[in-house]
């Protein structure tokens, strides 16, 4: 059976991993998943990420989850745009998550970036997910 929405699967693995207090998650890798993991690390939501695997093996994305005083750093991670219903926003209509305490990950013509970076660059795009 093929996976219909690999990004939703990634976000669900992160959500379930933090609920189970896991420190490391493993999942199939893709360029989009690595870009999302890079943003989550830059914004301080995860400790680190690594892509492992060689030519014969399929690449695996390892995500190291982050906790503060025993509680997950990511309180809420939610998929917004999905294959059956794409959500696009102009630069003036980009969401502000929790008054700037959270981020929206946006797919723009210049690549994957946070809502703050997209607003500064004057770009709109597809809203992939919200993280708080």
From Swiss-Prot:
Entry annotated with the keyword Plastid:
no
Q: Which Pfam families match?
A: Ribosomal_S8
Q: Which PROSITE patterns match?
A: RIBOSOMAL_S8
Asked whether the keyword Disulfide bond is assigned, the reply is: no
Q: Annotated Gene Ontology MF terms?
A: rRNA binding; structural constituent of ribosome
Gene3D superfamilies linked: 3.30.1370.30, 3.30.1490.10
**SUPFAM superfamilies from the UniProt entry:** Ribosomal protein S8
Mind listing the GO biological process terms from this record? translation
Swiss-Prot/TrEMBL keywords: Ribonucleoprotein, Ribosomal protein, RNA-binding, rRNA-binding
Per the record, its GO cellular-component terms are: ribonucleoprotein complex; ribosome
Protein family per UniProt? Belongs to the universal ribosomal protein uS8 family.
Q: Which NCBIfam families match?
A: PRK00136.1
Q: Please give the HAMAP family that the UniProt record associates with this protein.
A: Ribosomal_uS8_B
Q: Could you describe the subunit structure of this protein?
A: Part of the 30S ribosomal subunit. Contacts proteins S5 and S12.
- State what this protein does: One of the primary rRNA binding proteins, it binds directly to 16S rRNA central domain where it helps coordinate assembly of the platform of the 30S subunit.
**Could you tell me what this protein is called?**
Small ribosomal subunit protein uS8
Q: Which organism is it from?
A: Baumannia cicadellinicola subsp. Homalodisca coagulata
